[in-house]
């Protein structure tokens, strides 16, 4: 007889493994037991005889031990050493949601969300129990101060120091996706502590765990994570039949249990195992928790009568059919068998009773016929079951698998009904930094509504400055335009030649034959399709291209004759080439003591009507001849006040008095207002200077970008505040260089070299919005522009070379890519509109130092990242830099669905009410201001909630209120009252569309009054008869018109 006890993997001495040795060990054990019984008998009296009898008498059940002394000895050992350690705990009381979700798409957002939810559930359950958490190989989201057993096996384990803390009495042992790798779970789970696991317990032999594929071969799970790693491991049978597990206590060196183990006596703990599968999207995931019940000692070389199971690995292989896996699942109301070949993705599930029936048939034809009769009609099921019946085990297809890429994160408005992210962007590599930009969801009306609230409504500015600043405005207008009433606009033909961009040419061609018609007063807004960290920027495009063409005859002439004149050359930068701007920046920085960078917050939205009329538009009216005043006044007034609606969704809104980004004046007049704030600051700081001398002291202006002298900072902030705007002046730091137009000049005192702002570039460099183009071609087109403008920029240039190397062999040819009209759409603006910025190869080290200083990453980390770019062969293998600064995101939700910053409940409710109101308003057809003979402006709403209908806006239904008036209910939207409904009840209203009247006597009998986005009452037709009118849509891609020349 050989003793199979092990002590740390070493067998007992040979002298004790012989027959004589076993006799000695048994004799010593009996002596020990007799001594214990004698002592016990003196203390417990008459009960001892009955207790001793229970050890010896076999009892009503069949005996396991063949020897009565051996049975008595084992029974006595168990009875005399048992100890009650029962605990009670139900962690599912802390379950918050059974279908968690992440907002960002990283390739495994579903399974990742479930793991996050499991971690939160476990943490909150332990906290509510009043106990401490002891985690095995904790992940990066675990607080470092928590107790843990931590080793460095995976790269992510390096987030904290190695540790092997002692398990305290008040601790719950936790393992999240790590129990598979334990060689012996008894090391942790044989203490008197409860434990809880988030583990993988598949119910099929292959398939998907949320959004992650897995197969099983040789009883090892092959778990392939898109956007993550590939893991292979066996699975412990936590969810097998058997309520109680027995685990042998781990021996401490020189402890009592250690000495007892020499005699084959071991301490055992019984854990009560419970499990649940609470997550709908990941049924293969289980939450397993163990509750300690009892402990006792046992003699390992004697039979044991206790009924409990021992933990083991799951065996998925089918013993009777080599090469096949078979698993029976009882999580539903009936047994379901899952079969599939080892390592293959193909698997089928069918009722276990049905599989038992078909396996007993004599021919394969009978198998197929019986399966069809049972209702299994899928060809995959029939073929696989027949192969299983025939015991056909074929070679596993060995091939490389391309992981599904992660998707760009999106901006989620707080007040929205969005379920799934919809964006037109794609990633073509992993992020360079962890805090990538967010992408707008252009197809959602809530996104536009959110941008309107945060960029128009909430920043509306009606402030009027002091009389002193008003006098400075009069001086400034005269300085910019020394000669009054001498200007003549360009002809329409000349303006048409100047508007030479493809979108501009197309728009002008569509209205050229009707250019003599009156201009329609209408703004159509949409969210700009660009990555951002907050609410997306709004493009307020003027719907009528006649306005843009006719107004451009004035703006182009004014820029050429006035703004580019010699007296304005020192401050006005639009229209210059990158080389000219770089030289201008260096000359200005060298000419002042300390430069200062001006950073306006929401410049367009915060411009007041006073600024528009007394500074921006005033320079036009002063220069042009009086005979053009009436026409010019008509155009400039539209910049301040004009009806507006959502271009895609149709709802009306109040555009405010701020700058309209689609106007041809945007860049020029923003520069004028920007420079005026500098002029007023100089006048206040140095009142002894003449107006002309103060004007010459102003810095550089390009739209809302500015570079100024630091000595005027205090008064500059004061002037901007008086105008109702916000300005942040960045202090000059030589280690960070100087920034102008998002270009960093590392040392403008010695070189005009510049490079793109690193973090601003890296956050969006791996994205493309050209969804209809193969991703390889879109990536190459995008990075080719950066390799011209930033040929020597650290990290940026190496990343672009890496993308070229990885995609060059699989992308289309350069000729094919250049044939697309949008091939230059994502290239840097300056490459298309002026050429490359100057960069010297010898300044690389200088740019590296400044890049490290601006981003906060050490140079060594950047060099390691560059080395990674140069060595990888797959752009998805790069590891992003971990950006530790506070989150740059605003007005959105994080990946857990929580707001990233504090939320005002009233503001949130107002935004939600506005979103619901605009949703209802957008469903109906909108009467839009126009002139007789103009185009019909009615546009059908797009991507709105509710089913599409050929009956127009029939889903907008009127519901009676108690007072007899109507309220409106929009499909899938909360009920809301129409604004102003009671004021127009019973009256017809004149439509502004051609002067036609809409009344109850028209052919459209049902009308409802709806409050538009601007709060005005309007009439919507609930049902129309007759054919629909065609939509005359004019292409309006004029948002870059202000960057002409």
Swiss-Prot record:
Q: Name the Pfam families for this protein.
A: Noda_Vmethyltr, RdRP_1
Q: Which GO terms describe its molecular function?
A: RNA binding; RNA-directed RNA polymerase activity
**Top-rank EC class of the record's enzyme:** transferase
Q: Which CDD domains match?
A: ps-ssRNAv_Nodaviridae_RdRp (cd23173)
| Record key words, sorted | Nucleotidyltransferase, RNA-directed RNA polymerase, Transferase, Viral RNA replication
> Which residue numbers delimit the RdRp catalytic domain?
593-718
SUPFAM superfamilies to which the protein is assigned, alphabetical: DNA/RNA polymerases
Catalyses: RNA(n) + a ribonucleoside 5'-triphosphate = RNA(n+1) + diphosphate
User: Which GO terms are recorded in the biological process aspect for this UniProt protein?
Assistant: DNA-templated transcription
Which residue stretches does the UniProt record annotate as biased composition, category Polar residues?
Answer: 1033-1045
Give the enzyme's EC designation.
2.7.7.48
List every stretch annotated Disordered: 916-1045
Q: Which family, according to the similarity comment?
A: Belongs to the nodaviridae RNA polymerase family.
Report the protein's function.
RNA-dependent RNA polymerase which replicates the viral genome composed of 2 RNA segments, RNA1 and RNA2.
What name goes with this protein?
A: RNA-directed RNA polymerase
Protein source organism: Macrobrachium rosenbergii nodavirus
